[in-house]
Amino acid sequence: MVKIRLNRMGRRHQPFYRIVIVDSRNKRSGKYIESIGYYDPLNNSNQYKVDEDKALDWLLKGAQPTDTARRILRKMGVMKRYDEIKFQARKEKGVKESNEIVEPEGEEVKE
């Protein structure tokens, strides 16, 4: 399973995180597929930056964000766009299914 999670960087007592796409079986700071942003918790404004298009693309491919990554993506507005796209897809799928004509099974009744 592919995850969106934080990869710890920086020195001791001064953490800095990259937001990365990684196979869930890899180590916390192991090899990652792609880096899509960063998060600096020590900055007074909790500075973060995410490439929204890449994050949305990976979410649509099925990547699962961790809790902290999901919180950052929600602040950036990525999760809202993702939810809207998924809702629209479900809505269109429901319309297609309701437009199909279902013929009743069984024999016709003759009078």
UniProtKB/Swiss-Prot annotation:
Stretches for region Disordered: 92-111
InterPro entries: Ribosomal_bS16 (IPR000307), Ribosomal_bS16_dom_sf (IPR023803)
Keyword Ribosomal protein belongs to the record: yes
Record GO cellular component, one term: small ribosomal subunit
Any one Gene Ontology molecular-function term assigned to this protein's record: structural constituent of ribosome
Example GO BP: translation
Superkingdom of this protein's organism: Bacteria
Keyword RNA-binding (UniProt): no
UniProtKB keywords: Ribonucleoprotein, Ribosomal protein
Biased composition (Acidic residues): 100-111
NCBIfam families membership: S16 (TIGR00002)
Family in the record: Belongs to the bacterial ribosomal protein bS16 family.
Protein name: Small ribosomal subunit protein bS16
Record lineage: Bacteria, Thermotogati, Thermotogota, Thermotogae, Petrotogales
